[in-house]
Each structure stands twice: as C-alpha cells, then as structure tokens.
C-alpha cells in the first residue's frame, strides 16, 4: 500500500498522474487525516469534491502524539528539516505494515528513504 503525500496529490489534481491512477484503480492507496487537512487548506478546483473522494480512501495507522515524539527521538529526526506534520505522516507510514510513502517533498523523501519506507513512482 502506498501512502500518498499531499505534494503528490496536489500535482495529480492539477495534472493527472498515470501511476497514481493505476494505484487508485487497484485500491493500493492510503491517506492520512493530516494529508487531507493539508489539501483542504489549498486553493484547488473542485475542492469539495476532491475532499469527499479523499475521505473515501483507507487511512494509514493512526499514531498518537506521544508515539510521534518517541519516533522522533528513536530515529533522530530532529534537525532533518521535516516538520511535525511530516513526522506524523512518516511515523504512520513506518507503523503501517507494508506501507510505503510517496512524496515529492525532498526532505521528507530523504528521511523516508533512510527509514526504508520511501517509494518513488514519478
């Protein structure tokens, strides 16, 4: 299963991505509340329709704030340039069995690669 980051979704909304379309058709996509939240704050066409459709996609493991704090410490994520929302998404991908994170955010991708949860389907 592929946890698709907001950066990939936003690009897909603007210009459809064949790889993402195939994943969606196969049911191989996961989302996260924070990813949907980031997209909700964007100015995109058909915003409401997009948000309704995103909420239909299965979600990755929910991770508590305490688990994220522990994750940050255990994997020394401080100083990597990722933000707290990114740390939540990364921890969720890490803790969801078989999940991989697809992002176009360079710092998040590099960190996901170090944790062996990255995928790049561009």
Which positions does each model-derived feature cover?
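Non-catalytic, well-ordered alpha-helical scaffold segments
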Residues: 33, 37, 87-90
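Active-site neighborhoods of divalent-metal-dependent phosphate/nucleic-acid chemistry enzymes
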Residues: 12, 18, 59-122
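Short, well-structured N-terminal submotif of metal-dependent ribonuclease cores
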Residues: 1-34, 40-52
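Ligand-binding grooves and catalytic loops that recognize ribose/phosphate and carbohydrate rings
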Residues: 47-57, 67-68
């Amino acid at each position: 299963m592929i946890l698709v980051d907001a950066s990939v979704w936003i690009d897909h909304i603007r210009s459809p991505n064949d790889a993402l379309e195939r994943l969606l058709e196969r049911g191989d996509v996961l989302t996260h509340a924070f990813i949907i939240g980031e997209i909700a704050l964007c100015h995109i066409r058909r915003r409401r329709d997009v948000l309704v459709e995103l909420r239909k996609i299965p979600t990755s493991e929910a991770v508590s704030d305490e688990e994220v704090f522990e994750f940050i410490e255990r994997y020394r994520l401080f100083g990597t340039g990722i933000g707290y929302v990114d740390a939540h998404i990364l921890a969720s991908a890490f803790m969801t069995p078989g999940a991989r994170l697809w992002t176009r955010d360079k710092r998040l991708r590099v960190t996901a690669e170090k944790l062996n949860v990255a995928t790049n389907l561009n």
